């Protein structure tokens, strides 16, 4: 999802997306550890998405837009 699309979402939606991404990150790490992960690029993409969501959540909590 693009950052501009994420900025339009509410704080509750962002926290829900963050929870989903963190669960995905856990699944990806487990797949990598067991050797079942074919595309290792997913680790980086997922970690970046989590960072973007955390940044947007912090901005909304502080009142910045």
Swiss-Prot record:
Protein known as: Large ribosomal subunit protein uL29
Coiled coil: none
Keyword Ribonucleoprotein attached: yes
Species assigned in the record: Psychrobacter arcticus (strain DSM 17307 / VKM B-2377 / 273-4)
GO cellular component, one term: ribonucleoprotein complex
HAMAP family found in the cross-reference section: Ribosomal_uL29
Keyword field: Ribonucleoprotein, Ribosomal protein
InterPro entries the UniProt entry points to: Ribosomal_uL29, Ribosomal_uL29_sf
GO molecular function term, any single one: structural constituent of ribosome
Family membership: Belongs to the universal ribosomal protein uL29 family.
One GO-annotated biological process of the protein: translation
Gene: rpmC
């Amino acid at each position: 999802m693009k950052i501009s699309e994420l900025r339009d979402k509410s704080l509750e939606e962002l926290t829900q997306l963050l929870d989903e991404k963190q669960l995905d990150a856990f699944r990806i790490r487990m797949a990598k550890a067991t050797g079942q992960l074919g595309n290792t690029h997913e680790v980086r993409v997922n970690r970046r998405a989590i960072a973007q969501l955390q940044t947007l959540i912090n901005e909304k909590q502080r009142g910045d837009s």
